[in-house]
């Protein structure tokens, strides 16, 4: 998960005191919550919120490798990188950086999203405007 792909966006998250576990570092479940939050923010910035009556992404897979502990306080910059753009799926990679330590990767993550018709429960093509935005951002980053 160390490989870097074209960065199509970067989002920031401010760690909260309650995001720590008893050991005093960011609880491992919050890495996944942070990925979820930046993913939803990014999709909303493209004009696509979650509409349970229509079509949208579902999480088909996710993983995270914890490289260095993150302690409070911290502002995190999390990259959104394009690994693969398919007909109905999108594979993204992520790197977690502390704003006060920008050259160090604290964690690496990945997610696979599949666009589905929520009512029919079947995969559908990624909307053309999302596809175009992702392709344009990936070309600009290359």
Predicted regions and their residues:
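HotDog/MaoC-like acyl-thioester-processing domains
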Residues: 2-7, 11, 70-72, 83-142
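Hydrophobic pocket/interface hotspot
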Residues: 24, 80, 121
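Hydrophobic beta-strand-centered segment that forms part of the acyl-chain substrate-binding groove
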Residues: 42-91, 104-106
């Amino acid at each position: 998960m160390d490989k870097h792909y074209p960065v199509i966006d970067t989002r920031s998250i401010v760690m909260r005191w309650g995001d720590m576990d008893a050991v005093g570092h960011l609880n491992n479940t919050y890495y996944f919550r942070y990925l979820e939050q930046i993913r939803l923010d990014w999709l909303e910035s493209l004009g696509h919120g979650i509409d349970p009556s229509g079509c949208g992404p579902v999480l088909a897979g996710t993983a995270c490798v914890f490289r260095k502990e993150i302690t409070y306080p911290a502002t995190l910059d999390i990259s959104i990188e394009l690994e693969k753009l398919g007909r109905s799926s999108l594979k993204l990679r992520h790197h977690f950086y502390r704003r006060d330590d920008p050259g160090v990767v604290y964690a690496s993550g990945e997610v696979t999203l599949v666009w589905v018709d929520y009512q029919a429960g079947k995969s559908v093509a990624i909307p053309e405007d999302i596809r175009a935005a992702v392709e344009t951002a990936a070309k600009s980053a290359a």
